[in-house]
From Swiss-Prot:
UniProt KW Transferase keyword: no
Cellular compartment(s): Plastid, Chloroplast thylakoid membrane
Name of the protein this chain belongs to: Photosystem I reaction center subunit VI
UniProt record similarity statement: Belongs to the psaH family.
Function noted in UniProt: Possible role could be the docking of the LHC I antenna complex to the core complex.
Taxonomic superkingdom: Eukaryota
Any Pfam family matching the protein: PSI_PsaH
Taxonomic placement: Eukaryota, Viridiplantae, Streptophyta, Embryophyta, Tracheophyta
Membrane topology: Single-pass membrane protein
GN (gene name): PSAH
UniProtKB keywords: Chloroplast, Membrane, Photosynthesis, Photosystem I, Plastid, Thylakoid, Transmembrane
GO cellular component, one term: photosystem I reaction center
Length: 36
């Protein structure tokens, strides 16, 4: 795992991953969940 939160976007921790979403410019975890 690469820092967990950096790679895995948990719905429970979506508050913490919000910053990550900005980097991707996406609000939906769908495309990224598929990659994971």
């Amino acid at each position: 795992k690469y820092g967990d939160k950096s790679v895995y976007f948990d719905l429970e921790d979506i508050g913490n991953t919000t910053g990550q979403w900005d980097l991707y410019g996406s609000d939906a975890p769908s495309p990224y969940s598929x990659l994971q």
